[in-house]
């Protein structure tokens, strides 16, 4: 079933849903650059105003995956992505990137999908570059990195080249659109398990159900009630969990895991170098809030990766990975491996 762009726009004005096949068609037009900038802007703004449905988001993610440069990973067991939507305005250091090293050190395979900072002071790509990682890898090189080190970073512009067809429109609009929530749904390596942070509480239930439709295995979508797109130490965290095809929504608290509730204010950074310093301090087992929040998030990721039977068990594994020095060693391992591909 096809729909004209004008019909789709009218549908959004009337707050009516664009059906799955129609959304597939529309999204392909956008990704190919077949819509005028005016029409593309009108449609994605209309979707935002009426509020995108689970079906519309799932269809859009399906098309983004179609257009991606895929990373072929041979062994899908214990394979996880740790990612946030960003846009939470918290300006903290790169917690999910730090968690990647801990999660890999504890035995999971991590395919991290990220970009440079837009609303944040330091995106995952920025801090990895500050650490000395070569982020400009081709798909086969990322696959080799995952196989060799247990970690691979997929720099979004290298894996979603069709996004250039909507980039100028998004930049000029300057407001959140459906594309702000598609990134975490479109991992080019197809990681079946995921820890996903979101910038709004309503997205917890939406994103986990989108992942359910997309056939994911074990996913935890989280929103810290202090506004963080991470599992928070400063407040309760809302969780939407997909496991065995079923969705459960609940809250967790730092105290549930023997952790103290503390403010996240000390985690703020101004740039990638400050983020690098805080990340390395946490991985060097320096006591403090940074180490504890990395332990909490890595523990949750280890549960998502099915390495741990619970978040509590995952936290214990994360503590051991940091205390043993294995997590810190993973940084040097990734730097060494990726630098061989420097162009």
Swiss-Prot record:
GO biological process annotation, one example: L-tryptophan biosynthetic process
Enzyme's top EC category: transferase
Pathway: Amino-acid biosynthesis; L-tryptophan biosynthesis; L-tryptophan from chorismate: step 2/5
Subunit architecture: Homodimer.
Gene3D superfamilies: Nucleoside phosphorylase/phosphoribosyltransferase catalytic domain (3.40.1030.10), Transferase, Pyrimidine Nucleoside Phosphorylase, Chain C (1.20.970.10)
Domain of life, per lineage: Bacteria
Function: Catalyzes the transfer of the phosphoribosyl group of 5-phosphorylribose-1-pyrophosphate (PRPP) to anthranilate to yield N-(5'-phosphoribosyl)-anthranilate (PRA).
GO cellular component, one term: cytosol
Record's protein name: Anthranilate phosphoribosyltransferase
Binding locations of anthranilate 1: 84, 115
Stored Pfam families: Glycos_trans_3N (PF02885), Glycos_transf_3 (PF00591)
Alphabetical UniProt keywords: Amino-acid biosynthesis, Aromatic amino acid biosynthesis, Glycosyltransferase, Magnesium, Metal-binding, Transferase, Tryptophan biosynthesis
InterPro entries: Anthranilate_Pribosyl_Tfrase, Glycosyl_Trfase_fam3, Glycosyl_Trfase_fam3_N_dom, Glycosyl_Trfase_fam3_N_dom_sf, Nuc_phospho_transferase
Amino-acid positions noted as binding Mg(2+) 2 in the UniProt annotation, renumbered to this chain: 229-230
Family: Belongs to the anthranilate phosphoribosyltransferase family.
PANTHER family: ANTHRANILATE PHOSPHORIBOSYLTRANSFERASE (PTHR43285:SF2)
EC number: 2.4.2.18
Record's catalysed reaction(s): N-(5-phospho-beta-D-ribosyl)anthranilate + diphosphate = 5-phospho-alpha-D-ribose 1-diphosphate + anthranilate
UniProt remark on cofactor binding: Binds 2 magnesium ions per monomer.
Binding-site residues for 5-phospho-alpha-D-ribose 1-diphosphate, renumbered to this chain: 84, 87-88, 92, 94-97, 112-120, 124
Cofactor: Mg(2+)
Residues noted as binding anthranilate 2 in the record, renumbered to the chain: 170
Positions that bind Mg(2+) 1: 96, 230
Molecular function, one GO term: magnesium ion binding
């Amino acid at each position: 079933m096809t729909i004209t762009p004008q019909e789709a726009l009218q549908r959004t004005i009337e707050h009516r849903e664009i059906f799955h096949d129609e959304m597939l068609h529309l999204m392909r037009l956008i990704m190919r650059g077949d819509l005028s900038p005016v029409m593309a802007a009108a449609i994605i703004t209309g979707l935002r105003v009426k509020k995108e449905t689970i079906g519309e988001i799932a269809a859009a993610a399906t098309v983004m995956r179609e257009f991606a440069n895929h990373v072929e990973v041979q062994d899908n067991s214990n394979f996880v992505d740790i990612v946030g939507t960003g846009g939470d305005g918290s300006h903290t250091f790169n917690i999910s990137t730090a968690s990647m090293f801990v999660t890999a050190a504890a035995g999971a395979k991590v395919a991290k999908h990220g970009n440079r900072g837009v609303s944040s002071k330091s995106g995952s790509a920025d801090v990895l570059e500050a650490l000395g990682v070569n982020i400009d890898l081709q798909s086969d090189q990322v696959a080799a990195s995952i196989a060799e080190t247990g970690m691979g970073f997929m720099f979004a512009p290298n894996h979603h080249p069709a996004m250039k067809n909507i980039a100028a429109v998004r930049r000029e609009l300057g407001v959140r659109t459906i594309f702000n929530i598609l990134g975490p749904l479109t991992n080019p390596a197809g990681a079946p398990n995921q820890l996903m942070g979101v910038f709004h509480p309503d997205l917890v239930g939406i994103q986990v159900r989108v992942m359910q439709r997309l056939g994911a295995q074990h996913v935890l979508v989280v929103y810290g009630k202090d506004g963080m797109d991470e599992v928070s130490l400063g407040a309760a965290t809302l969780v939407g969990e997909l496991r065995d095809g079923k969705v459960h929504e609940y809250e967790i608290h730092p105290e549930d895991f023997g952790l103290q509730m503390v403010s996240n204010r000390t985690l703020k950074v101004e740039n990638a170098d400050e983020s690098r310093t805080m990340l390395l301090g946490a991985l060097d087992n320096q006591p403090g809030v940074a180490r504890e929040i990395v332990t909490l998030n890595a523990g949750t990721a280890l549960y998502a990766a099915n390495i741990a039977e619970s978040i509590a068990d995952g936290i214990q594994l994360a503590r051991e990975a940091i205390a043993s020095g294995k997590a810190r060693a993973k940084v040097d391992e990734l730097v060494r491996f990726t630098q061989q591909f420097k162009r």
